[in-house]
């Protein structure tokens, strides 16, 4: 080991009052959801015609939150630690012990969004486009929280100047892969989709943004996984791939299908509108 940046000594607990503690991870969820709520309102109002009312956006936040938490937890249980939870089923609802899966959360949010739109008679494609536009914002804050917690760290990288020794990652300096993911899945995808929505006619054919999000996230995750240490209970799979990469491949394929189908549809009959 020639050089390693010191890992910032940040307490995972932001505020502790008696038996109650607010962790950075919880704060990341709150900031991501509230930021997404505000941005969804902004995008809906700018659309012509508006995608939904402000009251609908408020209700969608509740549906999306439940979908994220339930789907994320069940996804982790099924994809990443099924044997453990089969032996200890009472631990499944113990979210404070950690263990959430993005891919499970995605399925949960999609399910919640479809059910919500059907209950309000809203366009699934138009609402879905807005959800896809705001999702990278939540991913950005979530990955920053992973970094603060010192979890989901990268693979050993003793020759990388910005490598860090993580508290639970052994003596070797490692890639700060959480920051890579925050950049790719968060900032880059957020800016790219936002620019496409603002300066192209993609929103005239609802569903195209959804497809691009699925493709963009899948490619970003597969790339970041080359630097991220796989989960200890799973390790590397066949040919050295990781579970995250395997789960991201169907996302890319689904994104291509969604984009092509949406692109072939008739555009919204709103001259110059979004």
Curated annotation (Swiss-Prot):
The chain crosses the membrane at residues 24-44, 60-80, 96-116, 122-142, 182-202, 207-227, 241-261. The keyword Secreted does not apply. Keywords: Cell inner membrane, Cell membrane, Membrane, Transferase, Transmembrane, Transmembrane helix. Its main location: membrane. Its EC number is 2.5.1.145. A 1,2-diacyl-sn-glycero-3-phospho-(1'-sn-glycerol) binds at residue 143. It is an enzyme of class 2 (transferase). Pathway: Protein modification; lipoprotein biosynthesis (diacylglyceryl transfer). Pfam families: LGT (PF01790). It is a multi-pass membrane protein. GO terms for molecular function: phosphatidylglycerol-prolipoprotein diacylglyceryl transferase activity. Catalyzes the transfer of the diacylglyceryl group from phosphatidylglycerol to the sulfhydryl group of the N-terminal cysteine of a prolipoprotein, the first step in the formation of mature lipoproteins. This is Phosphatidylglycerol--prolipoprotein diacylglyceryl transferase. It comes from Rhodospirillum rubrum (strain ATCC 11170 / ATH 1.1.1 / DSM 467 / LMG 4362 / NCIMB 8255 / S1). The lineage of its organism: Bacteria, Pseudomonadati, Pseudomonadota, Alphaproteobacteria, Rhodospirillales. The gene is lgt.
